[in-house]
């Protein structure tokens, strides 16, 4: 404690040196935080995915469709056991700020490829039977207060509906995850409904 006064007077003696020293320490911590966040963001997909999953997308953008013939070509590659479609929909719920991770998928294949996502059997069957059926992640359903049976309208700047209005979805299930890193904030609906209703 007797050296605190000496340290304080030394810090005040050369203010420029003190300021530059504190700034260099601050910059080091900021860089560490930013690089840690970048590492987490870039490695997040690897941590979430299993080693036995491969994602193939259009080289231009993830909102572009791959030709349907590619599905058979990919399925014929040795070692491939299952192929499923998934596309970025860019759904907006109520407010343009509420752009959600919304994906048209093939329900059975998607659930088979993502065993870490848990959906009760009766909800899965309802999803398979309901053309406009959709399932939401538990965190997304909690965020908006959605319950099974709700009718959810969504718009998208990417994929207009044939009738020009909002896309209408019936919430038939709420999925959860067995792995902590799995995403429970997505909104998934049937690819066949998307394919026939888009303009």
Q: How would you describe each model-predicted region?
A:
Residues 1-32:
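N-terminal Sec/SRP start-transfer signal
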Residues 1-5, 40, 54, 134, ...:
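Alpha-helical membrane and juxtamembrane elements of multi-pass inner-membrane transport
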Residues 10-11, 45, 174:
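Amphipathic alpha-helical segments that mediate coupling or scaffolding at interfaces
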Residues 26-103, 108-109, 119-130, 142-143:
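Hydrophobic, regular-secondary-structure patches
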Residues 53-57, 84, 99-104, 135, ...:
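Soluble periplasmic/extracytoplasmic beta-strand elements of cell-envelope proteins
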